[in-house]
Amino acid sequence: MIIGIGSDLSDIRRIQASLDRFGDRFRHRVFTEIERTRSDRKADAAASYAKRFAAKEACAKALGTGMRRGVFWRDMGVVNMRSGQPTMALTGGALRRLEEITPPGMTAHIHLSLTDDHPYAQAFVIIEALPAAPSAAE
């Protein structure tokens, strides 16, 4: 069952301007250490940051909160599964909200799609609730 959908379009030029103007202050306020490390290694760091910014906005929309109700930028981070597929790792208020919207007996799975075509970066997030796997004790 789908419990949340969000999308966002980010202007890479706007993210570049924020990086130029605010530098580390912007990077550390909005992005996790993993996101900063990954983006800083890219030839086009601004595009990488813009995709991650769009992912956070899309995830906040899928959670139904936006950037309020205890959900902060660094509570959501883009990470990659072993396959390389991107997903979101949630902590703090974002994780609490995910737990609130996940029905009992279900496990939330976050699906993330990222793309960019200068000057835009785009992200789609779908939060799906699937039946929880039975525990070994059952």
Swiss-Prot record:
Assigned EC number: 2.7.8.7
What this protein needs as a cofactor is: Mg(2+)
Q: What does this protein do?
A: Transfers the 4'-phosphopantetheine moiety from coenzyme A to a Ser of acyl-carrier-protein.
Could you identify this protein by its name?
Answer: Holo-[acyl-carrier-protein] synthase
What Gene Ontology molecular-function terms does this entry list? Answer: holo-[acyl-carrier-protein] synthase activity; magnesium ion binding
Does this entry carry the keyword Lipid biosynthesis? yes
Supply the InterPro entries for this chain. Answer: 4-PPantetheinyl_Trfase_dom, 4-PPantetheinyl_Trfase_dom_sf, ACPS, Ppantetheine-prot_Trfase_dom
Indicate where this protein resides in the cell. Answer: Cytoplasm
One GO BP annotation here? fatty acid biosynthetic process
- Per its UniProt entry, which superkingdom is the organism in? Bacteria
User: Might you report a single GO cellular component term?
Assistant: cytoplasm
Q: Which family does it belong to?
A: Belongs to the P-Pant transferase superfamily. AcpS family.
Binding site residues for Mg(2+)? 8, 57
Q: One Pfam family for this entry, by name? A: ACPS
Per the UniProt entry, what species is this protein from, by scientific name?
Phenylobacterium zucineum (strain HLK1)
The catalytic activity, as recorded, is: apo-[ACP] + CoA = holo-[ACP] + adenosine 3',5'-bisphosphate + H(+)
Which controlled-vocabulary keywords does the entry list? Cytoplasm, Fatty acid biosynthesis, Fatty acid metabolism, Lipid biosynthesis, Lipid metabolism, Magnesium, Metal-binding, Transferase
